[in-house]
Amino acid sequence: MTNIRKTHPLAKIINNSFIDLPAPSNISAWWNFGSLLGICLILQILTGLFLAMHYTSDTATAFSSVTHICRDVNYGWIIRYMHANGASMFFICLFLHVGRGLYYGSYMYPETWNIGIILLFAVMATAFMGYVLPWGQMSFWGATVITNLLSAIPYIGTSLVEWIWGGFSVDKATLTRFFAFHFILPFIVSALAAVHLLFLHETGSNNPSGIPSDSDKIPFHPYYTIKDILGALFLILVLMMLVLFSPDLLGDPDNYIPANPLSTPPHIKPEWYFLFAYAILRSIPNKLGGVLALVFSILVLAIIPLLHTSKQRGMMFRPLSQCLFWLLVADLLTLTWIGGQPVEHPFITIGQLASILYFAILLILMPTISIIENNLLKW
């Protein structure tokens, strides 16, 4: 009798994706982040669902409903902080996952890569709207500043912003619709993640050496299931350390002040995972230019496959490209730091230089260095 997992229509899909899937024998821990992102997404949906049971999306009661969750709901505090810090873990895994893709040339699977970029935008949109929901000072002013950026769009800008707001300022209508979108988007993200996997399994996984691994495959289970479980345990350990020891480490204290349209906080800044993009936005004096740079800072990933000039897929055997890659990482850390600083000298100049360097590395230096490396191979 044939095994039911290989014949049953539903079990067959799971079997071909997670059990009998032929995987390269040499993929490293950098390939763990896909499964970790899946775990993060499930965790966020579950904690979010329980938070939504107690949250009210009304300007008069939103802040106090979050307080009520933390004070009065059984284990409400841990659910709330797991959700808030779970978002941070989600983005850490996302950045490492994208970084892995850049380093090892995983962008050479264009469908998987492009769905990944759409996923990144969707998760960023979800996180932004989630940050508005507690209706603290940073929630309100963050929503005001970021939605206001759309007014830079010529001709339709102002009408578009008022349409998104549902009025002439960020108010009750804005909060209600943001809650609705924040609730539905993670399910759209789940569907996109399934498509992401579908395209990945069409080609099979990349591996650190960057050469085809068809001649040397091993079954996903038990080898990579156990490896993923180890990664998951480490993820949960770090998350729970954050939640139980310093839950507000990555948050902004201003968000414990209820939203007040009449009082602007001294420094309006988004959550840490948006700071690099925020720094790029601020480093351009022109409003429309800043918005375009902000969008392009993520969208630039879409043209990376077109700029691949190297004869090798990954950077494993390309020391010059490796140096450039780690310079890019340092540059992104610099941008993240600048995004959290006030707009004054010397931070403005550092931000502008870091922004120029970011685009220069991705668009000019990487392809150029790859050509130089190709020529070095001939020596």
Swiss-Prot record:
UniProt keywords, alphabetically: Electron transport, Heme, Iron, Membrane, Metal-binding, Mitochondrion, Mitochondrion inner membrane, Respiratory chain, Transmembrane, Transmembrane helix, Transport, Ubiquinone
Record's superkingdom?
Answer: Eukaryota
Relay the cofactor remark from the entry. Binds 2 heme b groups non-covalently.
InterPro entries from the xrefs? Cyt_b/b6_C, Cyt_b/b6_C_sf, Cyt_b/b6_N, Cytb/b6-like_sf, Cytochrome_b, Cytochrome_b_C_euk/bac, Cytochrome_b_N_euk/bac, Di-haem_cyt_TM
One term of GO molecular function: metal ion binding
Q: Which residues bind a ubiquinone?
A: H201
Residue numbers binding heme b b562: H83, H182
Q: Would you tell me the Gene Ontology cellular component terms?
A: mitochondrial inner membrane; respiratory chain complex III
The UniProt entry, under PROSITE patterns, shows:
CYTB_CTER (PS51003), CYTB_NTER (PS51002)
According to its UniProt record, where is this protein mainly located?
mitochondrion
**What does the UniProt entry say about where the protein is found?**
Mitochondrion inner membrane
The membrane-spanning stretches of this chain are 33-53, 77-98, 113-133, 178-198, 226-246, 288-308, 320-340, 347-367
Changing A125T has the effect of: In strain: Isolate MME-K2
Q: How the protein sits in the membrane?
A: Multi-pass membrane protein
Residues binding heme b b566 are H97, H196
Assembly information from the UniProt record: The cytochrome bc1 complex contains 11 subunits: 3 respiratory subunits (MT-CYB, CYC1 and UQCRFS1), 2 core proteins (UQCRC1 and UQCRC2) and 6 low-molecular weight proteins (UQCRH/QCR6, UQCRB/QCR7, UQCRQ/QCR8, UQCR10/QCR9, UQCR11/QCR10 and a cleavage product of UQCRFS1). This cytochrome bc1 complex then forms a dimer.
Q: Briefly, what is this protein's role? A: Component of the ubiquinol-cytochrome c reductase complex (complex III or cytochrome b-c1 complex) that is part of the mitochondrial respiratory chain. The b-c1 complex mediates electron transfer from ubiquinol to cytochrome c. Contributes to the generation of a proton gradient across the mitochondrial membrane that is then used for ATP synthesis.
Q: What else is known?
A: Heme 1 (or BL or b562) is low-potential and absorbs at about 562 nm, and heme 2 (or BH or b566) is high-potential and absorbs at about 566 nm.
Which protein is depicted? Cytochrome b
Organism name: Martes melampus
Source organism phylogeny: Eukaryota, Metazoa, Chordata, Craniata, Vertebrata
Gene symbol of the encoding locus = MT-CYB
